[in-house]
Amino acid sequence: MNAQELRSKTPDQLRDQLVALKKEAFNLRFQQATGQLENTARMRAVRRDVARIKTVLNEMAASAAAN
């Protein structure tokens, strides 16, 4: 998922996706703690996706406030 794809979505869609990613991150942390996590790179990818979504949401909020 890249920033261009995210910018084409509505804020509600982004918030829904953010909730889903946070749930996934929670589950990945549990898997890591119990030694069941095989793909540790997924944790990094999820964390960065969350950051991308938050960045795009903040950009949208800033542009809405400026108008």
Curated annotation (Swiss-Prot):
InterPro entries: Ribosomal_protein_uL29, Ribosomal_uL29, Ribosomal_uL29_CS, Ribosomal_uL29_sf. SUPFAM superfamilies: Ribosomal protein L29 (L29p) (SSF46561). GO terms for cellular component: cytosolic large ribosomal subunit. CDD domains: Ribosomal_L29_HIP (cd00427). Pfam families: Ribosomal_L29. The keyword Ribonucleoprotein applies. The keyword Ribonucleoprotein applies. This is Large ribosomal subunit protein uL29. Belongs to the universal ribosomal protein uL29 family. It comes from the Bacteria. One of its GO terms (molecular function) is structural constituent of ribosome. Gene3D superfamilies: 1.10.287.310.
